[in-house]
């Protein structure tokens, strides 16, 4: 997790939120990610969120692109936590420091929704006694929102042409080779092979464009039955099936210790895909690419978890290790069949 820099005193934080007319007495730390610090605060009667990106992590121009995309989505009916301009008229502010370098500050409004991971339907409210297992409206809405974003990508352009690209596969493979023990060198090779296959996929406006890049439950709210999106830090140019596959992978991992893993996995995928299909069609070629992306994400997860020691990393590593082979049991699902599936949940 990101470490708060020594220069970020209460006074310095006051000066930063002051760019958005923030009230110092209302500031609350909201946590951190690998490269960001998050703070909530009030300004002119609204709750807002400051995202402070640490020096060297993102080019400010790329952050400008990120939030141009967020604004574009909002202008076209997608619920996304919208940025606010500073009193200088800027969407993105650069905070210079003579020793630690420049940090990048962005402020968005705070969602009024409920985090998806805390909603009644997530894993798996619809299966509670007295509910209709056919419904799963949040899963369908999740898929529908994904498809709507992908449809909108075709019409989006930024002043710089959106320069942020997908992960650097060769660099990740080299990292895996460096950090894993020699006995696990096949893992790095699997990562390289998956990336090489991914790079051979077609690139056109029907399959490739700006994607969220981390469209998982952890980055979504439920707001009056609609999906509201935040954390666009991983948005980039990529394949739309990448977005779909990361959603599926993260949910499969969340289900990995459930008694009826397969039944609930199929339930989720079929409902998510049902929602996606209501807005945008996928052909069999792209559905057949889902297992490739799942293997890629799984290998990445294994490498990342091998560098951590907390209990959550242990769960991730266990799931990833069990599915490193080409015959990964967790991914042995009929994605084409689930895409067109209309039936109910058969689990108990």
Segments the model singles out, each with a brief description of its role:
Residues 1-91, 98, 224-226, 340-348:
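Conserved NTP-binding catalytic cores of kinases and kinase-like/nucleotidyltransferase enzymes
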Residues 2, 161-201:
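Active-site catalytic-loop/activation-segment of kinase and kinase-like phosphoryl-transfer enzymes
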Residues 18-25, 193-204:
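Short Pro/Gly-enriched beta-strand edge/turn motifs at strand-loop
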Residues 34-45, 49-50, 83, 196-242, ...:
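Active-site acidic catalytic loop and adjacent metal/ATP-binding pocket
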Residues 43-156:
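ATP-binding pocket architecture of kinase catalytic cores
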Residues 137, 141, 282-294:
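All-alpha amphipathic helical-bundle segments outside canonical DNA-binding/catalytic cores
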Residues 301-348:
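ATP/Mg2+ or Mg2+-diphosphate-binding catalytic cores
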């Amino acid at each position: 997790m990101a470490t708060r820099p020594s220069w970020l005193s209460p006074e310095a934080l006051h000066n930063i939120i002051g760019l958005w007319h923030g009230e110092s007495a209302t500031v609350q730390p909201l946590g951190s990610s690998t490269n960001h610090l998050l703070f909530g605060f009030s300004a002119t009667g609204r709750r807002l969120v400051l995202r402070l990106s640490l020096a060297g992590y993102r080019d400010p121009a790329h952050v400008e692109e990120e939030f141009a995309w967020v604004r574009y989505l909002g202008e076209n009916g997608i619920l996304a936590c919208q940025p606010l301009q500073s009193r200088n008229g800027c969407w993105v502010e650069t905070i210079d420091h003579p020793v630690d370098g420049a940090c990048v500050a962005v402020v968005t409004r705070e969602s009024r929704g409920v985090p998806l991971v805390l909603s009644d339907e997530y894993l798996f409210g619809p299966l509670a006694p007295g509910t209709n297992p056919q419904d799963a409206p949040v899963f369908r809405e999740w898929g529908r929102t994904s498809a709507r974003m992908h449809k909108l990508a075709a019409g989006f352009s930024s002043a710089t042409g959106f320069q942020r690209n997908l992960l650097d596969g060769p660099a990740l493979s080299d990292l895996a080779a460096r950090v894993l023990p020699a006995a696990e060198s096949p893992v790095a090779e699997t990562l390289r092979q998956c990336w090489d296959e991914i790079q051979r996929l077609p690139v056109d406006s029907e399959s490739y464009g700006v994607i969220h890049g981390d469209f998982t439950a952890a980055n979504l709210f439920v707001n009056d039955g609609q999906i509201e999106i935040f954390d666009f830090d991983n948005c980039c140019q990529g394949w739309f099936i990448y977005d779909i596959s990361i959603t599926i992978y993260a949910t499969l991992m969340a289900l990995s210790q459930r008694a009826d893993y397969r039944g609930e996995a199929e339930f989720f995928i079929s409902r998510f895909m049902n929602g996606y299909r209501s807005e945008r069609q996928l052909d069999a070629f792209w559905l057949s690419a889902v297992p490739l992306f799942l293997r890629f994400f799984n290998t990445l997860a294994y490498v990342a978890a091998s560098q951590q020691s907390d209990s959550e990393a242990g769960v991730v590593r266990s799931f990833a290790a069990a599915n490193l082979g080409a015959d990964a049991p967790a991914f042995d699902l009929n994605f084409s069949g689930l895409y067109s599936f209309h039936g109910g949940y058969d689990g108990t």
